[in-house]
Amino acid sequence: MLSPRRTKFRKQQRGRMKGLASRGNTINFGDFGLQATEPCWITSRQIEAARRAITRYVRRGGKIWIRIFPDKPITMRPAETRMGSGKGSPEFWVAVVKPGRIMFEIAGVSEEIAREAMRLAAQKLPIKTKFVGREEEYN
């Protein structure tokens, strides 16, 4: 699972996901990509599940790039704990994804294989996504 090696602070505020992605919204490495059309937190487990789905389908051919990284710690309180006594401990890591963000890229395979691989990956993610080629992008 993906997570930062070390961070400046252990805990972060939740924040908001307003607007479209201004960075990471174009295909830079591969030929085809999977683009988010909704804002969401994507956990490191979901990223790993999507990555496995893509690699299983394309087998030996093609190269895959993961364009999102879970760098935000999400804290949780233990079950049946009273209010107060501070913020909970970090439980898992998420990547903040805004609409328009390219999450995965793939190269070295045909469009049919890439489309099916991205469809399988999209089923592992909690948001609506869009398959894009190098020429057509969201913003």
Swiss-Prot record:
GO terms for cellular component: cytosolic large ribosomal subunit. GO terms for biological process: translation. The keyword Zinc-finger does not apply. The keyword Heme does not apply. One of its GO terms (molecular function) is tRNA binding. Keywords: Ribonucleoprotein, Ribosomal protein, RNA-binding, rRNA-binding, tRNA-binding. Part of the 50S ribosomal subunit. PANTHER family: 50S/60S RIBOSOMAL PROTEIN L16, LARGE RIBOSOMAL SUBUNIT PROTEIN UL16M. Binds 23S rRNA and is also seen to make contacts with the A and possibly P site tRNAs. Belongs to the universal ribosomal protein uL16 family. This is Large ribosomal subunit protein uL16. The lineage of its organism: Bacteria, Bacillati, Cyanobacteriota, Cyanophyceae, Oscillatoriophycideae.
